[in-house]
Amino acid sequence: EYQSKKIMADHGVTVQRFFVADSANDALEAAQRLKAKEIVLKAQILAGGRGKGVFNSGLKGGVHLTKDPKIVEQLAKQMIGYNLSTKQTPKDGVTVKKVMVAEALNISRETYFAILMDRACNGPVMVGSPQGGVDIEEVAVTSPELIFKEEIDIFEGIKDHQALQMAKNLGFKGPLQQQAADQIKKLYNLFLKIDATQVEVNPFGETPEGQVVCFDAKINFDDNAEFRQKEIFAMDDKSENEPIENEAAKYDLKYIGLDGNIACFVNGAGLAMATCDIISLNGGKPANFLDLGGGVKEAQVYQAFKLLTADPKVEAILVNIFGGIVNCAIIANGITRACRELELKVPLVVRLEGTNVHEAQRILNESGLPIMSANDLEDAAKKAVASVAKK
């Protein structure tokens, strides 16, 4: 949160005054420097639901309001260095290394505003709602008429009349309307300059003093822009990731751990999600989401198996590859090498389709290894689930 607020402030977007602290003493000094009527102290982790989270220090809640800087210090002592568990963190929570000490502003009205890339529109769109501070997905279901969407011409940007109309749709009145429109245009300039794919401000609110403020923001960046956004990508704190995720990233593998016992080894995020779904539909539980991506090499296949077999929860592995860019024969060679060198001890189900699939099937069939081949994804899922059930 503090990173997104700094980025916004650097681009002229109005945010509340704040400092970041990595010790209780620093938090106290920050609170004293703010000289605010009321202070909000927020634990800084890459997860939502902080307000209702619980620390292993015994403290409840990762967001606290107080008027006393000394209380800020006491609370920070129970936050920094302790794990905060929320609905979005692993069971053991995530270690809090920093806290944000900010001026607490009263919000007289909350709205929602976002700019994001929309494939259906082949470009950026503005999305807004006069109902902010709540889950926008819920608003879309219960009150779809309160969701306003406007396409943005990538060559001309947000025009003045578009920004004003969105401000009206969000319910801003009088001088606040122009103020909100100005903030909307600044957010779009930010969106472009930092190569964002999404800038979501919730709440995008107004104060009793007549100020439009971006109170909280979520920003997603285009990974392909890393070469020209080095400063932003350097902010990425990989220490909050599971160690296995960081290890996978070394080999250009995308890994997300899940709670089941059937490991998934797939190319492409969409196919990986579909594989997890079909395992679940057949009564199994996926142990992970592992996306091999395109341009794969045999060494990556070996490393992927090494990661999967290191997970003690894994009782079976399902390989599901649809070879377009990916050469199935390379996958097959990687699989056979991994099985031999790692002495695979769990059932392995393989479904291959696409480029060089016949050569791949020959490699697997002639390997002499106990590999179960599957005709399609449904067949693969059933075999993987059945292999676990036999244990």
From Swiss-Prot:
<dbReference type="GO" id="GO:0005524">
    <property type="term" value="F:ATP binding"/>
</dbReference>
<protein>
    <recommendedName>
        <fullName>Succinate--CoA ligase [GDP-forming] subunit beta, mitochondrial</fullName>
        <ecNumber>6.2.1.4</ecNumber>
    </recommendedName>
</protein>
<dbReference type="InterPro" id="IPR005811">
    <property type="entry name" value="SUCC_ACL_C"/>
</dbReference>
<comment type="function">
    <text>GTP-specific succinyl-CoA synthetase functions in the citric acid cycle (TCA), coupling the hydrolysis of succinyl-CoA to the synthesis of GTP and thus represents the only step of substrate-level phosphorylation in the TCA. The beta subunit provides nucleotide specificity of the enzyme and binds the substrate succinate, while the binding sites for coenzyme A and phosphate are found in the alpha subunit.</text>
</comment>
<comment type="similarity">
    <text>Belongs to the succinate/malate CoA ligase beta subunit family. GTP-specific subunit beta subfamily.</text>
</comment>
<dbReference type="InterPro" id="IPR017866">
    <property type="entry name" value="Succ-CoA_synthase_bsu_CS"/>
</dbReference>
<keyword id="KW-0460">Magnesium</keyword>
<dbReference type="InterPro" id="IPR034722">
    <property type="entry name" value="Succ_CoA_betaG_euk"/>
</dbReference>
<dbReference type="GO" id="GO:0006104">
    <property type="term" value="P:succinyl-CoA metabolic process"/>
</dbReference>
<feature type="domain" description="ATP-grasp">
    <location>
        <begin position="5"/>
        <end position="233"/>
    </location>
</feature>
<dbReference type="InterPro" id="IPR013815">
    <property type="entry name" value="ATP_grasp_subdomain_1"/>
</dbReference>
<keyword id="KW-0547">Nucleotide-binding</keyword>
<keyword id="KW-0342">GTP-binding</keyword>
<feature type="binding site">
    <location>
        <position position="267"/>
    </location>
    <ligand>
        <name>substrate</name>
    </ligand>
</feature>
<dbReference type="GO" id="GO:0005739">
    <property type="term" value="C:mitochondrion"/>
</dbReference>
<dbReference type="InterPro" id="IPR016102">
    <property type="entry name" value="Succinyl-CoA_synth-like"/>
</dbReference>
<keyword id="KW-0816">Tricarboxylic acid cycle</keyword>
<dbReference type="Pfam" id="PF00549">
    <property type="entry name" value="Ligase_CoA"/>
</dbReference>
<dbReference type="InterPro" id="IPR005809">
    <property type="entry name" value="Succ_CoA_ligase-like_bsu"/>
</dbReference>
<dbReference type="InterPro" id="IPR013650">
    <property type="entry name" value="ATP-grasp_succ-CoA_synth-type"/>
</dbReference>
<feature type="binding site">
    <location>
        <position position="105"/>
    </location>
    <ligand>
        <name>GTP</name>
    </ligand>
</feature>
<dbReference type="GO" id="GO:0005525">
    <property type="term" value="F:GTP binding"/>
</dbReference>
<keyword id="KW-0436">Ligase</keyword>
<feature type="binding site">
    <location>
        <begin position="49"/>
        <end position="51"/>
    </location>
    <ligand>
        <name>GTP</name>
    </ligand>
</feature>
<keyword id="KW-0496">Mitochondrion</keyword>
<dbReference type="Pfam" id="PF08442">
    <property type="entry name" value="ATP-grasp_2"/>
</dbReference>
<dbReference type="GO" id="GO:0006099">
    <property type="term" value="P:tricarboxylic acid cycle"/>
</dbReference>
<feature type="binding site">
    <location>
        <position position="202"/>
    </location>
    <ligand>
        <name>Mg(2+)</name>
    </ligand>
</feature>
<feature type="site" description="Important for substrate specificity">
    <location>
        <position position="38"/>
    </location>
</feature>
<feature type="site" description="Important for substrate specificity">
    <location>
        <position position="106"/>
    </location>
</feature>
<dbReference type="GO" id="GO:0046872">
    <property type="term" value="F:metal ion binding"/>
</dbReference>
<comment type="subunit">
    <text>Heterodimer of an alpha and a beta subunit. The beta subunit determines specificity for GTP.</text>
</comment>
<feature type="binding site">
    <location>
        <position position="16"/>
    </location>
    <ligand>
        <name>GTP</name>
    </ligand>
</feature>
<dbReference type="GO" id="GO:0004776">
    <property type="term" value="F:succinate-CoA ligase (GDP-forming) activity"/>
</dbReference>
<keyword id="KW-0479">Metal-binding</keyword>
<feature type="binding site">
    <location>
        <begin position="324"/>
        <end position="326"/>
    </location>
    <ligand>
        <name>substrate</name>
    </ligand>
</feature>
<feature type="binding site">
    <location>
        <position position="216"/>
    </location>
    <ligand>
        <name>Mg(2+)</name>
    </ligand>
</feature>
<comment type="pathway">
    <text>Carbohydrate metabolism; tricarboxylic acid cycle; succinate from succinyl-CoA (ligase route): step 1/1.</text>
</comment>
<dbReference type="GO" id="GO:0042709">
    <property type="term" value="C:succinate-CoA ligase complex"/>
</dbReference>
